[in-house]
């Protein structure tokens, strides 16, 4: 499946019910990855409102709280600025306890990494090796503030591997990918694992 679902695209109570059912049906194999959303063109393509980054991050934190409440409580209630649930029942519960591993995706240093420190089991960052080391240090500081054991959180690196036999082949592959995704070529060519065979 995809690396990370965008919180803005589904009501978090509904998404939690879907995730719980998938975990139950799969014998406890779901890993739940969610982020605040970032790609404005995708929002526009599917007719979703594209709130400011601050609003999307507040929505993500509320969604994380709903996910945890609905997977661990018989009847969950939550009153937030963006989402509300009242005695929401989530059955079947996920098989994994307390809930399927929670990936908090994104590398924003002030808020997203704080949310990872507070709620997440896994983090995933779209950076180079130096950026990975830097994000890890920031996460560690957030863990200290949250009184969270930093070593409990698994840190992962997201990168694209695109290798061409030669420059012409690489350019052709990049063009196909850009045509399909609409993501600018620079988002790929700035990564360390994009190039020609040597």
Pin down the residues of each PLM region.
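Active-site-adjacent structural elements that line small-molecule/cofactor binding pockets in enzymes
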Residues: 1-198
């Amino acid at each position: 499946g995809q690396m990370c679902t965008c919180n803005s695209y589904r009501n978090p109570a509904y998404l939690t019910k879907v995730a719980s059912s998938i975990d139950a049906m799969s014998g406890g194999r779901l890993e739940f990855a969610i982020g605040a959303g970032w790609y404005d063109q995708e929002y526009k393509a599917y007719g979703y409102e594209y709130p400011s980054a601050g609003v999307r991050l507040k929505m993500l934190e509320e969604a994380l709280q709903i996910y945890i409440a609905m997977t661990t409580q018989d009847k969950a209630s939550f009153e937030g600025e963006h989402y509300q649930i009242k005695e929401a029942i989530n059955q079947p519960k996920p098989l994994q306890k307390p809930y399927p591993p929670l990936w908090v995706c994104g590398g924003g240093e002030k808020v997203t990494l704080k949310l990872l420190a507070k709620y997440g089991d896994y983090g995933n960052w779209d950076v180079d090796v130096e950026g990975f080391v830097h994000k890890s240090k920031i996460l560690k500081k957030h863990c200290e503030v949250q009184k969270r054991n930093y070593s409990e959180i698994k840190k992962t690196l997201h990168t694209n591997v695109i290798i061409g036999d030669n420059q012409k082949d690489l350019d052709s592959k990049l063009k196909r990918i850009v045509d399909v995704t609409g993501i600018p070529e620079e988002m790929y060519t700035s990564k360390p694992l994009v190039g020609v065979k040597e």
